[in-house]
Amino acid sequence: MTNPKLVLAYSGGLDTSVAIKWLQERGYDVIACCLDLGEGKDLDFVKEKALKVGAIKSYVIDVKEEFADEYALIALQAHALYEGKYPLVSALSRPLIAKKLVEIAELEGAVAVAHGCTGKGNDQVRFEVSIKALNPNLEVIAPVREWSWSREEEIEYAKKHGIPIPVDLDSPFSIDQNLWGRSNECGILEDPWAAPPEEAYELTAALENTPDVPEIIEIGFEQGVPKTLNGKPYSLASLILELNAIAGKHGVGRIDHVENRLVGIKSREVYECPGAMTLIKAHKELEDLTLVKEVAHFKPIIEQKLAEVIYNGLWFSPIKDALVAFLKETQKNVTGVVRVKLFKGHAIIEGRKSEFSLYDEKLATYTADDQFDHQAAVGFISLYGLPTKVYSIVNNQKKVNV
């Protein structure tokens, strides 16, 4: 009788490498799955390591374009910043990882999937809620959450079973990265008073090491989608990665955040999102030019709710679909070019233009070219202020009669 198959979200690190052997001991044939989300990792090495540790098959899937087009783009168009600061770096990738785990499980006839999350973080929720939404019949196993070993016990287990110990195991930081950005926690970062050491950063330069001359870039959008950088066409994934390099060189996109986790605790995280933060700022400026007032004023309510929904692991849910439907409707005329100056940690908008611009210079100007009907303001003010005037009359009369 053959063993049941299980698909493991595999990173190549100690936890998921140990998980392969741990799951084998519980009777599963393990299939490893690693996604290329644009983090720059040596994925051929990861694929081979999974097989050496004991996986019967090892998948490495390039999902950079899918991640950019179907996940990061929604976050960009929603200006999605959880609690006003966090661009949802890890939260965006988890539903895509879950989707691929389920797809491979169904392809391979697996009965279960597994992830390497602890019982303390948000990712366990994001993975398991997403997996159950996509295939309720799959069992979900969380080895790290179940075994409850200390780090020393885990290393001892790895040595006993010939599992390679990562060379960066002594690093105090826990890092997650994809093309939308890089998150970092643990070590000295657990003290919210401590300044993050420079070694905590990788994508962005320290301000004192950034160029002393600003760099001007132009980003072209079509219906809310970034299409060009300095006039050159890019796929969205390539454009984000290019912006990570350019804006990161100028120190743009460093975020230090004490956030409220889904599981009920506060956590201090350090993020680097140079491309994401530059794009969000540019996109918002183009919306300011092209959206009517009522939509522009209501959209932030949708944005905040969507950021919370994504952060809380509800990507595959009716509420997320409903919010995105509104979002897509708002992007029809968000077409144009935004000029950005990158300098000393800042992305400064210096210009914007669009064929759908609702800005009319002849209405806005105070020069002789002014075409605004000033006399129309008299009647407008009278009607606009009428409810306030009536309220004041009624309440003042009551005060007099007391």
Curated annotation (Swiss-Prot):
Keywords: Amino-acid biosynthesis, Arginine biosynthesis, ATP-binding, Cytoplasm, Ligase, Nucleotide-binding. Its EC number is 6.3.4.5. InterPro entries: Arginosuc_syn_C, Arginosuc_syn_N, Arginosuc_synth, Arginosuc_synth_CS, Arginosuc_synth_type_1_subfam, AS_cat/multimer_dom_body, Rossmann-like_a/b/a_fold. L-aspartate binds at T118, N122, D123. The gene is argG. It catalyses: L-citrulline + L-aspartate + ATP = 2-(N(omega)-L-arginino)succinate + AMP + diphosphate + H(+). Its main location: cytoplasm. The keyword Ligase applies. This is Argininosuccinate synthase. Pfam families: Arginosuc_syn_C, Arginosuc_synth. It comes from the Bacteria. ATP binds at A9, Y10, S11, G12, G13, L14, D15, T16, S17, G116. GO terms for molecular function: argininosuccinate synthase activity; ATP binding. Pathway: Amino-acid biosynthesis; L-arginine biosynthesis; L-arginine from L-ornithine and carbamoyl phosphate: step 2/3. It is found in: Cytoplasm. Homotetramer. L-citrulline binds at Y86, N122, R126, S174, S183, E259, Y271. Belongs to the argininosuccinate synthase family. Type 1 subfamily. PANTHER family: ARGININOSUCCINATE SYNTHASE (PTHR11587:SF2). GO terms for biological process: argininosuccinate metabolic process; L-arginine biosynthetic process; urea cycle. GO terms for cellular component: cytoplasm.
